[in-house]
Curated annotation (Swiss-Prot):
Entry EC number(s): 6.3.2.13
Source organism (scientific name): Wigglesworthia glossinidia brevipalpis
Binding residues annotated for UDP-N-acetyl-alpha-D-muramoyl-L-alanyl-D-glutamate, in chain numbering: L29, S31, N159, T160, T161, S187, Q193, R195
Enzymatic class: ligase
Binding site for meso-2,6-diaminopimelate: R392, D416, N417, P418, R419, G467, E471
Residues with N6-carboxylysine modification: K227
Catalyzed reactions per annotation: UDP-N-acetyl-alpha-D-muramoyl-L-alanyl-D-glutamate + meso-2,6-diaminopimelate + ATP = UDP-N-acetyl-alpha-D-muramoyl-L-alanyl-gamma-D-glutamyl-meso-2,6-diaminopimelate + ADP + phosphate + H(+)
Annotated protein name in UniProt: UDP-N-acetylmuramoyl-L-alanyl-D-glutamate--2,6-diaminopimelate ligase
């Protein structure tokens, strides 16, 4: 929709210009997607600078171009090509969230945005919150790994946390649809790249921190600092932290008014903070029964949720809704109907055939939590099928091999997005962590690996397929092909 914008006000306080009214349609980062009256944002990229594509943007109809510069002396310089203003903008990437917020009328100021960060659990927590409100008959917007939209009506997205422009655009979209609460997964990449700088968060949730993305952040300290940005530098009203995580314990010391959750009843009773913890817990074949105590009340719920780590996710979700003012008893009454999100601890069961579980776990911590949860609930032998992504953090491969070795009677190494890296090299890196190589089979074809495990295991076993979960593709060097663990398992077990 075309807007007539006062460019002088729009660029204030960053840039002073005499250009007043200008027609603007939307803000875009991709010159190929520019249409008439769009703003083209030319940022530094991994391989190219966006300024190399300004002529394409002009040809496609851009009405104004902002070029990121790291030279402060160039800031505010304006020149024209075919009467189109080209403006240099110092550190544009940092200010893009606020600029986009201006364009989309700062939607987060008029709604409750729940931001979730952590290595694992972001998608599950956002799903629990959305499902809980769905059970109460309310709508909530979702932005995250599984896409964006409302529960059961999601559109796929490329990244967990969208670009600064897309985040503001989506919040504006939800607001126009009278959806006043949005749950957003906030990744370390999104935080480091300033994508959510200008979003007002009603609450920020921290789930956990463990090894991941070291190929990007270089070390765990940098990785933690990226996550910490949500709690230390952005506009947040309520802080909700998992005390069972080591980093969470440290952060609570830095944020004395944070709300604390724990699955261990004696760990947080001493705190005067608002809190929620588990008094008693029983893991069974069909889920988990737990007794909860909190600053809002106590209850006993029987859930279809597996694993202690997912109980943490449930508590964090519960507290997030309580801080928004939802009734404790109403939430507790429908908790038994909560389900896991797509591709998380997805259980397939057919009589006289091994139970098959598909899970997204692709980090050492997530792997260990899923494996230990299966032992806890089912007490069966585990066949683990997994691989590690190519061109990504290599240091976690041997660790994941070691963890699988501890819990599994059989390990099948297979492809999981090898990209441009040699699959043999990836498998060899994983094998370094495995002491008993006699239990290892290498089957590069993921389809053949899954079929082999199901055919050769028995009904007393669990076949655990790790790494992809909801994903529906395999990424190789020169191609991206359709592949879904869940569709394949359905086809094998149910002949569909």
């Amino acid at each position: 929709m075309i807007k007539i914008i006062n460019l002088k006000k729009f660029l204030f306080p960053w840039i002073s210009t005499d250009i007043s009214k200008i027609k603007l349609n939307s803000i875009k980062l991709n010159s190929k997607k520019i249409i008439k009256n769009d703003i083209f944002i030319a940022l530094y990229g991994n391989c190219n600078h966006g300024k190399n594509f300004i002529f394409e943007a002009i040809k496609n109809g851009s009405s104004i171009i902002l070029i990121e510069t790291k030279n402060i002396l160039k800031h505010g310089i304006i020149y024209f090509i075919k009467n189109i203003p080209i403006i240099y903008f110092y550190n544009l990437n940092y200010s893009l969230s606020e600029l986009s917020g201006k364009f989309y009328l700062h939607p987060s100021r008029y709604m409750n945005v729940i931001g979730i960060t952590g290595t694992n659990g972001k998608t599950t927590i956002s799903h629990f919150i959305a499902k809980w409100l769905f059970l109460l008959g309310e709508k909530i917007g979702i932005i995250g790994t599984l896409g964006y939209g409302c529960l059961n009506k999601m559109k796929k997205s490329k990244n967990t946390t969208n670009s600064a422009i897309k985040c503001q655009k989506l919040l504006n979209f939800f607001l126009k649809k009278n959806i006043n609460t949005v749950v957003m997964e906030v990744s370390s990449h999104g935080l480091h790249q300033n994508r959510v700088n200008n979003i007002n968060f009603f609450s920020a949730i921290f789930s956990n921190l463990s090894q991941d993305h070291i190929d990007y952040h270089k070390n765990m300290m940098q990785y933690e600092q990226s996550k910490w940005k949500l709690f230390s530098k952005l506009n947040v009203y309520k802080y909700i932290i998992n005390y069972d995580d080591v980093i969470g314990k440290n952060w609570i010391k830095k944020i004395p008014n944070s709300i604390i959750v724990s699955t261990k009843k004696n760990s947080i009773k001493k705190f005067k903070n608002l809190k929620m913890y588990v008094k008693d817990i029983f893991f069974h074949y069909f889920g988990t029964k737990l007794s909860i105590s909190s600053s809002w009340g106590s209850c006993v719920i029987n859930t279809k949720i597996f694993g202690e780590f997912n109980i943490n996710n449930l508590l964090l979700s519960f507290v997030a809704l309580l801080t928004l003012g939802y009734n404790f008893k109403s939430l507790a009454n429908v908790a038994e109907n909560l389900t896991m999100p797509n591709g998380r601890m997805k259980i397939f069961y057919v009589k006289k055939i091994p139970r098959v579980i598909v899970d997204y776990a692709h980090t050492p911590d997530a792997l260990e939590k899923v494996l230990s949860a299966i032992k806890l609930h089912f007490k069966k032998n585990i066949w683990s099928i997994f691989g590690c992504g190519g061109d990504r953090d290599k240091s976690k491969r041997r660790v994941m091999g070691k963890i699988c070795d501890l819990y599994s009677i059989n390990i099948i190494l297979t492809n999981d997005n090898p990209r441009s890296e040699s699959e043999t090299k990836i498998f060899n890196d994983i094998k370094i962590g495995i002491k008993n190589l006699n239990k290892v089979n290498i089957i590069p074809s993921r389809e053949h690996a899954i079929k082999f495990a199901i055919d050769n295991s028995n009904e007393k076993d669990i076949v655990l397929i790790l790494g992809k979960g909801h994903e529906e593709h395999q990424v190789f060097k020169y191609k991206k092909v359709f592949f879904s663990d869940q569709i394949l398992v359905n086809k094998i077990l149910y002949k569909t």
